[in-house]
Structure formats: structure tokens, C-alpha cells
Design a protein with these regions (language model features):
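Glycine-rich phosphate-binding loop of actin/hexokinase-like ATP-binding domains
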Residues: 82-109, 148, 152-187, 220-266
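N-terminal glycine/serine-rich phosphate-binding loop of ATP-dependent small-molecule kinases
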Residues: 1-94, 147, 217-224
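Active-site phosphate-binding/coordination module
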Residues: 67-130
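Glycine-rich beta-strand-to-loop/alpha-helix junction loops that act as flexible
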Residues: 73-81, 206-208, 249-252
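Gly/Ser/Thr-rich active-site cleft segment
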Residues: 13-15, 117-219, 223-229
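Short, hydrophobic/amphipathic alpha-helical packing segments
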Residues: 54-62, 131-134, 227-234
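A short acidic-Thr-Gly-centered motif at the start of a beta-strand
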Residues: 1-3, 212-217, 236-241
Length: 266
């Protein structure tokens, strides 16, 4: 017999650990599951086991749905992991692993990145700039880029798997990527230089319902998704707490401070 409770679901993908959490309408945890994220080699680079993460998630959701009604689903994920989807709606890469040393294999990236005051993104090593990952693929794997219809951020990759709808989202797209112009609120000059303007789906709000997935007797609303630490920051920003500093911990420590002025950043 199924309980009357309607559950909301959060898939929280960290670089090391994955959590799938089921909440009731009072935000009390009813069920939770844990897994690990792993990587392998494909097309000569490190890629994450994102398709397996999706299948694991779907299997757990189906199991819980036998006892509970389901309401909404949202995915949060760590930054700098991108899926490449071809024109037949198949994965070419899902998803890139930022621990691959992209910076060792290509030159010239530093010459074409936007100014700091455009993207507010420092130049980082390995794949910690999504723009560097895409620059590498454009230089070393042009055949993959030609086959690519869309680049999907990790949360929106999961959303696409759930709904078959393509979207982007600003908290992820702008998170140390070199891909977003914060002053003009649009894709950056780097995207234009690489001629990738049409390879990013339209931006939607993180909290927008993108589609509905039928699972058992439930019609599960699929929310667009968001970068994990930004989701934590938004929660406290919308609370009554003022002038706070947030430390988001896990594989990385990310620090947010409301008082910092963008003019002071270099």
C-alpha cells in the first residue's frame, strides 16, 4: 500500500559522493541513498560515469515510488562537467571530468579568454575552467565538436535524460567557466571566438519545471537544476540571515561572502 505522502527528490552529485534524498512536504528526510562517482577514459580524456549515475537514480526512484507518491525532482552538481550530445540525441561524452590535465596538451588558451571583468573567472589548472575543456576538444577532437548539437551542464544533462528537453542554467554556466559575460548577461566573447553560440541551449531558471516524467503512478515534475554550492548560497540568501559568510564543504571548500564587492576582485 502506498503512503499518502508526496515526496520531493534531490539528486546531489558531488565530485566524490552522490546522494539521492527523498523529502516530505515538511522537508523531513524520508529516504536517502548514497553512491560514489567514478571516472574512466573515453576519446582520450577522463569522463565521469554519468550515464550510470542516471540509471542508478532512476532505479532508486522507481523503488521508492512503489510506496510513496512523487512530486518534484531536482539535480544539483559540482561544477565544470559537460555532456556533448549529438544531432541524433545520443551522448558523445557524458560528462567531462575536470581532473584531466587539459592545460598540458593545448597552448594559446590564455590568449583568447575573456578579461576577468567580463567572466570573473581566474585561469585555473586541469579542467577547472569549462572553457578550457571545450577549447581542448575543439583543438584535439574537432570531429567530436562537429558532431555535437549541444553542450549540456551536468544538472541539465540529468534533466535532459529525464525529459528529453535541452536547457542551460546560469549558476552552472557561469561558475569559473570563462563562458558567461556577467556584465552583459549573455554568453562570453570566448564562446563567440570558438563559434559555439548555437551549441548552448537556452537558459532557464534553476527552479523552472522543464518536463514531467511518468514513473509508476506518479507524474514527477523535473526541475531544471543548479550548481550545488550556488544552491546552498541561494537558500541562505533567501532566509532572514543578513551579512553571512557561507562555507560550502565537500571535495572542495567554497566560500561565499555577501559583502564582497566585484570591483575589488582581480
Amino acid at each position: 500500500m502506498r503512503a499518502n505522502k508526496k515526496l520531493n527528490i534531490v539528486l546531489d552529485i558531488g565530485k566524490t559522493n552522490i546522494k539521492l534524498i527523498f523529502f516530505d512536504q515538511n522537508n523531513k528526510v524520508v529516504k536517502s541513498f548514497n553512491s560514489k562517482q567514478r571516472s574512466t577514459k573515453k576519446h582520450g580524456i577522463k569522463v565521469l560515469n554519468s550515464p550510470s549515475v542516471y540509471e542508478w537514480t532512476l532505479q532508486k526512484i522507481k523503488t521508492v515510488e512503489k510506496k510513496y507518491q512523487l512530486n518534484k525532482f531536482v539535480c544539483t552538481a559540482h561544477a565544470c562537467s559537460t555532456a556533448l550530445i549529438d544531432f541524433n540525441d545520443k551522448e558523445l561524452i557524458a560528462c567531462t571530468d575536470y581532473e584531466f590535465p587539459y592545460h598540458k596538451y593545448v597552448k594559446g588558451y590564455q590568449k583568447i579568454i575573456p578579461s576577468f571583468n567580463e567572466s570573473y573567472t581566474p585561469l585555473l589548472e586541469n579542467g577547472l575552467n569549462t572553457g578550457l575543456q571545450l577549447y581542448y576538444l575543439n583543438q584535439k577532437k574537432p570531429e567530436l565538436i562537429k558532431k555535437t548539437k549541444y553542450f549540456l551542464n551536468y544538472p541539465q544533462y540529468i534533466t535532459w535524460k529525464m525529459t528529453n528537453n535541452y536547457t542551460s542554467e546560469i549558476s552552472y554556466l557561469g561558475c569559473h567557466t570563462h563562458l558567461w559575460d556577467f556584465k552583459k548577461n549573455k554568453l562570453s566573447s570566448l564562446v563567440k571566438k570558438l563559434k559555439f553560440q548555437n551549441k548552448f541551449p537556452s537558459n532557464e531558471k534553476a527552479w523552472k519545471t522543464i518536463g514531467v516524467k511518468k514513473i509508476g503512478h506518479s507524474k514527477l515534475q523535473i526541475i531544471n537544476g543548479v550548481h550545488d554550492s550556488n544552491a546552498s548560497y541561494l537558500y541562505f540568501k533567501n532566509s532572514n540571515i543578513k551579512n553571512f559568510t557561507l562555507v560550502s564543504s565537500g571535495t572542495w571548500y567554497i566560500i561565499f561572502n555577501q559583502k564582497n564587492s566585484l570591483k575589488k576582485l582581480k
